[in-house]
């Protein structure tokens, strides 16, 4: 689905590499076209051939109407037996880590079929630092599968039927980690759609 909005600009992100291993990122999302998405836009979606829906915490953070749209997306996905994957993707430029913010992101985490936090994000959201305890926390609240990203240590995964740690892919030199989480999510979702076990 592509919706055009002649009244608002497309959101953008610019990244400035200041020195090896470091960068500055600038976001231009306020009053973007995406921030005006609403429940009616979600209701117009044809979900008949969709296997999975993936979104991050950025989507509901950009406006109240986007948060409502995200809720409607989750609702419609569940009604159509579509797997919902949620990555909190915490961004200090968007979130203040207030109790209201944490409650909102936990709402989406607990309504997702698959939750993909980093260890640091999970600690912010639930106060736990042990990957298995984090997984148990969300599974006990309705999430079916939890995958905790552990950086160089790989990823911990748990569901009702499997549990373990997957190693990272070895690289001789890491130039930039931007987009690594998105790439990880894409691979994971592809595997889920193909019904490949997490382990």
Feature map (PLM): residue ranges:
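Short, hinge-like loop/turn segments at secondary-structure boundaries
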Residues: 18-21, 101-105, 135, 162-166
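Conserved N-terminal subdomain of the carbohydrate kinase-like
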Residues: 1-57
């Amino acid at each position: 689905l592509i919706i055009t909005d002649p009244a608002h600009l497309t959101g953008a992100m610019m990244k400035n590499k200041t020195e090896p291993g470091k960068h500055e990122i600038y976001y231009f999302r306020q009053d973007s076209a995406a921030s005006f998405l609403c429940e009616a836009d979600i209701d117009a979606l044809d979900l008949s051939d969709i296997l999975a829906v993936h979104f991050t915490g950025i989507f509901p953070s950009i406006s109240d109407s986007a948060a409502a749209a995200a809720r409607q997306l989750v609702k419609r996905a569940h009604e159509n037996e579509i797997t919902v994957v949620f990555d909190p993707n915490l961004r200090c430029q968007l979130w203040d880590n207030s109790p209201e913010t944490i409650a909102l992101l936990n709402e989406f985490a607990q309504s997702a079929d698959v939750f993909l936090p980093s260890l640091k994000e999970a600690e912010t959201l639930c106060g736990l630092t042990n990957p298995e305890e984090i997984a148990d926390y969300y599974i006990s609240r309705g999430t079916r599968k939890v995958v905790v990203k552990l950086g160089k240590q790989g990823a911990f995964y748990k569901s009702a039927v499997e549990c373990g740690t997957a190693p990272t892919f070895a690289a001789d030199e890491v130039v930039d980690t931007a987009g690594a989480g998105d790439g990880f999510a894409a691979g994971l979702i592809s595997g889920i759609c193909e019904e490949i076990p997490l382990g």
